[in-house]
Amino acid sequence: MTPADLATLIKETAVEVLTSRELDTSVLPEQVVVERPRNPEHGDYATNIALQVAKKVGQNPRDLATWLAEALAADDAIDSAEIAGPGFLNIRLAAAAQGEIVAKILAQGETFGNSDHLSHLDVNLEFVSANPTGPIHLGGTRWAAVGDSLGRVLEASGAKVTREYYFNDHGRQIDRFALSLLAAAKGEPTPEDGYGGEYIKEIAEAIVEKHPEALALEPAATQELFRAEGVEMMFEHIKSSLHEFGTDFDVYYHENSLFESGAVDKAVQVLKDNGNLYENEGAWWLRSTEFGDDKDRVVIKSDGDAAYIAGDIAYVADKFSRGHNLNIYMLGADHHGYIARLKAAAAALGYKPEGVEVLIGQMVNLLRDGKAVRMSKRAGTVVTLDDLVEAIGIDAARYSLIRSSVDSSLDIDLGLWESQSSDNPVYYVQYGHARLCSIARKAETLGVTEEGADLSLLTHDREGDLIRTLGEFPAVVKAAADLREPHRIARYAEELAGTFHRFYDSCHILPKVDEDTAPIHTARLALAAATRQTLANALHLVGVSAPEKM
């Protein structure tokens, strides 16, 4: 019985108790909250349902808790239900009911933890979207890991997810990039406000090698050649780096296509027609303050050029027109103002603003021996996705970026993540999985299987701790999806690995050399198999491998 199963049982019992006393059942919460007590001596689970509804039905909380406890104790799945304090219920599961969690995991396999509670969502998940003017820096790398994991978590919760990369190939930064490449090809200094670094020289050399005539063309033609080839080469490098990192996209959307297709003009006309765009001093302004923004925004400047937000507006419209009812933007720390801006754009176009969500990720700092490794695309000392992977490997890189909330800045200590010790979180979790695989191999050698296991034998405290931790996984996945917080999966994996290691140290899973196989060995092997499956499922959701040997 998982916590969710217990919550359902408690609610059904509460309905019966209230109905039998002719009390109003409509006051019951839609979802009964079940938690693990801080002190294990208080039981397996606790609920405050009696405190929640007692006043609403005109009853003393302890009296209501007493009625509920008596009714619950009569159920075969419940070993005991005791009242604590003003009306809390502390519940212990019967051993057989607790063991049901293990059986459920083994039956569901790779789908354990999945649900369909977000099946109503068609999600456009846009992340990374780094400018094609340089390699992906650490901030973009964080989104590459977190965004991919969030997509996995949303899909595990039933949502349809389209992973999208917005390719910023329209704007002055591309011109600066082209001029930087051209200067490098000519052996000239980097232009003011241009891009520097070895990658600029490498791309420039590749362009000249591919087009020996490049520098002999007319200046405008030369610049256009370096622009087109440079952007294409840089973008191919970005896509290759992301693929090697385990992050792939369904759609690569070119910003320039919004202008070439007339989508920007169409969106502007829609806003003019519905009165949400007005003219002032020769410019056209979005009435964004009417939709929650802190100021109205210029969409078309007085010189007739489109402001940057014009592309954003057209892009919002395009996403909704493709059938997405939830559009998630994962943006950097310097984009906080975009939250109100994008929601206002959606509302002004006639779409539901709640169909736009903006997640803001904070900066990433790389440390070596306690000293910061600086990153600066223009100074040529950029620390990239490739650099991080080369330093600590793909699994450690992804895990280090995912396990913390994106709301806070992140320091990555290279020494910690390079280490093969329990201090390294990803090593600790992966080692747990590898140890479980080793147990399975040894069991096969001994001819021990989990078939026909009597799971009611799992009554040791460490066994109970492990089973209850396993039972929490579906709720963790649900919370990670609902709150858009995949770091919850990583933290859960660490908790599960730790709980397993403590179980392993206290309970002999397989028979010793001089022992015959007993029913407890079979039951513990089943528990180990369920733990292995759940750890593998968690690691999959964060896009990290589950090694069988280490």
Swiss-Prot record:
InterPro entries: aa-tRNA-synth_I_CS (IPR001412), Arg-tRNA-ligase (IPR001278), Arg-tRNA-synth_N (IPR005148), Arg-tRNA-synth_N_sf (IPR036695), ArgRS_core (IPR035684), DALR_anticod-bd (IPR008909), Rossmann-like_a/b/a_fold (IPR014729), tRNAsynth_Ia_anticodon-bd (IPR009080). Its EC number is 6.1.1.19. Gene3D superfamilies: Arginyl tRNA synthetase N-terminal domain, HUPs, Isoleucyl-tRNA Synthetase, Domain 1. Induction: Up-regulated by arginine and repressed by lysine. It is an enzyme of class 6 (ligase). It is found in: Cytoplasm. GO terms for cellular component: cytoplasm. Keywords: Aminoacyl-tRNA synthetase, ATP-binding, Cytoplasm, Ligase, Nucleotide-binding, Protein biosynthesis. It catalyses: tRNA(Arg) + L-arginine + ATP = L-arginyl-tRNA(Arg) + AMP + diphosphate. A motif ('HIGH' region) lies at residues 130-140. One of its GO terms (molecular function) is arginine-tRNA ligase activity. One of its GO terms (biological process) is arginyl-tRNA aminoacylation. Monomer. Belongs to the class-I aminoacyl-tRNA synthetase family. This is Arginine--tRNA ligase. It comes from Corynebacterium glutamicum (strain ATCC 13032 / DSM 20300 / JCM 1318 / BCRC 11384 / CCUG 27702 / LMG 3730 / NBRC 12168 / NCIMB 10025 / NRRL B-2784 / 534).
